[in-house]
Curated annotation (Swiss-Prot):
Gene: rplP
Source organism per UniProt: Alkaliphilus metalliredigens (strain QYMF)
GO CC field: cytosolic large ribosomal subunit
Descriptive protein name: Large ribosomal subunit protein uL16
GO biological process, one term: translation
Residue stretches of biased makeup (Basic residues): 1-16
């Protein structure tokens, strides 16, 4: 399970997820990627389940990059506890994902295998996602520069 080794503060505010992802929105390491289309908190267990699904699908071929990390602690109070008495203790960790963020990348496998592996990972995640390739992004980037 992914979680930070050390943190400055044990409890953080919930925050808001507004706008598009400005960082991590391009396929940088691999050839294929899985892009988030909705904002969400992705838990460390969901990231791990998606990673296992992908690695089992591609077997020993190819390489997988996880481009999100759960930095945010989510607190919970025990069941049947009265209100007040402070904030609860950290229960699990989440990664804050905005639309446009590339969450996983793959390389070293044919496109059909990559599509299948990322499709399996999609089903482990609580949001709508999209399969993207590095070539698609380079073409789109070139069109934007010309206009």
């Amino acid at each position: 399970m992914l979680m930070p080794k050390r943190v400055k503060r044990r409890r953080v505010h919930r925050g808001r997820m507004t706008g598009q992802a400005t960082k991590g929105n391009k396929v940088t390491y691999g050839e294929y990627g899985l892009m988030a289309l909705e904002p969400a908190w992705i838990t460390s267990n969901q990231i791990e389940a998606a990673r296992i699904a992908m690695t089992r699908s591609i077997k020993r071929g190819g390489k997988v990059w996880i481009k999100i990390f759960p930095h945010k602690p989510v607190t919970k109070k025990p069941a049947e506890t009265r209100m007040g008495a402070g904030k609860g203790s950290p229960e699990f960790w989440v990664a804050v994902v905005k639309p446009g963020r590339i969450m996983f990348e793959l390389a070293g496998v044919p496109e059909d295998k990559a599509r299948e592996a990322l499709r399996l990972a999609m089903h482990k995640l609580p949001i709508k996602t999209k399969f993207v390739t590095r070539q698609e992004q380079e073409v789109k980037g070139g069109e934007a520069d010309e206009n």
